[in-house]
Amino acid sequence: MLIENVEYDVLLERFKKILRQGGLKYTKQREVLLKTLYHSDTHYTPESLYMEIKQAEPDLNVGIATVYRTLNLLEEAEMVTSISFGSAGKKYELANKPHHDHMICKNCGKIIEFENPIIERQQALIAKEHGFKLTGHLMQLYGVCGDCNNQKAKVKI
């Protein structure tokens, strides 16, 4: 289920429903995790999300295992999306953003979001040419970001 541009209260109610259906408790820790994702454009690893929550809510007793379990639950419910970095793990973002694609730096892991109407139209044309009913797509471009390219150039001098 697509959840683009959903208000936080609606998202929170959906999350509570998913927890109830799974026989799980709604906790302050889980709410803070969802709220952190909602109010950020960051692509988080479980560890970086855990650290952000600990920094923002130092008195909140949240464990890294809770972060992992909650992210998995949210991903299964299609409330978050992830980008896999193989053995280096995943980075997560809330699935409430309008459609976008990603450029991913192979050196530093930086993720740049972009949307290009020409690419979107071309994908639709390709699908049509093949009699394919396009229902969605995920595009990830891999390469080396400008910062890493600039650092390589400085080293060569």
From Swiss-Prot:
Chain positions recorded as Fe cation binding sites: H99, D101, E120, H137
GO molecular function, one term: DNA-binding transcription factor activity
Statement: the UniProt record of this protein carries the keyword Ubl conjugation: no
Alphabetized SUPFAM superfamilies for the sequence: Winged helix' DNA-binding domain
Lineage: superkingdom: Bacteria
GO-annotated cellular components: cytosol
Keyword annotations from UniProtKB, A to Z: Cytoplasm, DNA-binding, Iron, Metal-binding, Repressor, Transcription, Transcription regulation, Zinc
A Gene Ontology BP annotation from the UniProt entry: negative regulation of siderophore biosynthetic process
Localization (cell): Cytoplasm
Known role: Acts as a global negative controlling element, employing Fe(2+) as a cofactor to bind the operator of the repressed genes.
Sequence similarity: Belongs to the Fur family.
Assembly and oligomerization: Homodimer.
Descriptive protein name: Ferric uptake regulation protein
Organism listed in the record: Campylobacter jejuni subsp. jejuni serotype O:2 (strain ATCC 700819 / NCTC 11168)
Lineage start: Bacteria, Pseudomonadati, Campylobacterota, Epsilonproteobacteria, Campylobacterales
Gene name tied to this protein: fur
